[in-house]
């Protein structure tokens, strides 16, 4: 958020998102959609999808969570279809979306604890994993987003 502030793009980005414009946030691009982030210090997010970004709670985990992991769909839609359920995607992260409404979670993943891996509000999507590094399933997700958003 500090870099977005330095670049003076927080206001235009919020205006863009408030118009329910199409957006796909990847990793940190998803995390900035939250209300608050708790990395080095408490930081206000864009507040588009209510919730907080906090570090994994399980101290026994290897952090960052790096590698392939399965997503489990809560519900599908035009972009995130049933074809992605139980498929592996590539993750690299230490922080997760918490205190989020279930209605905003399209998919979750388990890594020591259950966490949202795909979130949505209107035309705004966020994915915690890296679809660009996730082989055919990731490319399929990006293709769906481009063609259907």
Spans of features found by a protein language model:
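Short, conserved clusters of charged catalytic residues that mark active-site
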Residues: 8, 75, 137
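Acyltransferase
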Residues: 124-149
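Pocket-forming structural segment of enzyme catalytic cores
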Residues: 11-15, 35-111
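Short, surface-exposed beta-strand/loop micro-motifs that present aromatic residues
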Residues: 113-120
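A residue-level structural signature of the nucleotidyltransferase/glycosyltransferase Rossmann-like core
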Residues: 22-25, 45-46, 63, 88-89, ...
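Flexible gly/pro-rich beta->alpha loop and the following alpha-helix that scaffold active-site loops
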Residues: 1-25, 30-44
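Alpha-helical elements of Rossmann-like donor-binding domains used by nucleotide-donor carbohydrate transfer enzymes
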Residues: 12, 114, 140-144
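Histidine-centered divalent metal-coordination motifs
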Residues: 27, 93, 130
